[in-house]
């Protein structure tokens, strides 16, 4: 879906596809973290990125249409548009996970607490004017050493910086997305905002049966959905059918895990007073499986032998690390 208001401006197809890849991957990461930590601020960032993906998708389609005049040129861009559409689908599914938090869908707190033990923390903090971070580079700050946290993305007004490096200089008003261990969050937050970090008080009753099984499934679904996205982009970079088949296998496994998690919810519903506390888990299962489906849509361009335009390879190579399959 395109934004209601937009203004077309010429964009490079390679840059657009690179940005769509980076944005969709970040959204998946943030969406799961928002759900696990019940963090509305991070969930809102996911929806902001979803709006951005709509705009990128619009510009991608416009640029593709304007760059073709002949049938053979249009055929060459079919793969580009398929990859872009799949990236948009990944973003939409990540947005659905974020809405679990914003719409207060039911995921029991004891399940979230158990999930936190298996995941690193993601925190959002805005750089204040008086912050020691303002005006300094990430290399100077050495946040990974000082706090045990590292910045994975920065929102600067409406622009995003993905995978910032040591030379990236922070500014007042930058919204930092950082990953690390729970112990480092208070110091990182205070360094950025100059305010004391106040963790949320958590109260919950232990009512869930076979909780460990649900945690295992959700952690596996999260890891497999993220892996399938990374593998899918690697498959098209190397035009590698072996990697593409791995994505297909992950997609089939995700289908089974979705049904298994749904079955767990139905069984657990017998033992809870309010079944609404489990509603979000069903939503999570469907959204996670949708991410895997979309990743398969990317890999399918290789399996169907759709001609891969050089734009795709350049876009993926311009992004982050890639994955190869070892025999």
Summary of predicted features, one role per range:
Residues 1-327:
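Cytosolic, long alpha-helical scaffolding segments
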């Amino acid at each position: 879906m395109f934004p209601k208001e937009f203004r077309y401006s010429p964009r490079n197809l390679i840059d657009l596809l690179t940005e769509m890849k980076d944005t969709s991957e970040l959204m998946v990461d943030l969406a799961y973290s928002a759900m696990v930590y019940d963090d509305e601020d991070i969930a809102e960032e996911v929806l902001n990125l979803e709006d951005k993906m709509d705009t990128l998708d619009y510009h991608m389609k416009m640029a593709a249409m304007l760059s073709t005049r002949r049938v053979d040129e249009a055929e060459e861009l079919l793969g580009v548009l398929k990859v872009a559409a799949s990236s948009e689908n990944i973003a939409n599914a990540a947005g659905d996970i974020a809405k679990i938090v914003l719409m207060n869908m039911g995921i029991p707190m004891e399940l979230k607490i158990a999930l936190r033990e298996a995941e690193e923390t993601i925190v959002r903090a805005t750089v204040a004017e008086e912050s020691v971070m303002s005006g300094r580079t990430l290399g100077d700050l050495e946040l990974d050493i000082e706090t045990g946290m590292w910045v994975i993305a920065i929102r600067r007004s409406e622009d995003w910086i993905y995978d910032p490096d040591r030379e990236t200089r922070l500014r007042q008003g930058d919204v930092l997305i950082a990953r690390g261990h729970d112990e480092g969050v208070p110091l990182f937050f205070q360094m950025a905002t100059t305010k004391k970090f106040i963790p949320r008080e958590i109260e919950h009753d232990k009512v869930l049966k076979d909780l460990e099984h649900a945690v295992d499934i959700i952690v596996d679904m999260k890891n497999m959905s993220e892996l399938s996205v990374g593998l899918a982009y690697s498959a098209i970079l190397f035009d590698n059918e072996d990697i593409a088949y791995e994505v297909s296998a992950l997609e089939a496994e995700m289908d089974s895990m979705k049904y298994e998690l749904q079955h767990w919810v139905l069984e657990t519903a017998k033992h809870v007073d309010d079944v609404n506390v489990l509603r979000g888990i069903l939503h999570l299962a469907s959204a996670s499986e949708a991410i895997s489906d979309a990743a398969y849509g990317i890999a399918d361009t290789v399996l169907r032998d759709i001609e891969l335009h050089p734009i795709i390879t350049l876009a993926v190579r311009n992004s982050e690390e890639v994955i190869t399959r070892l025999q």
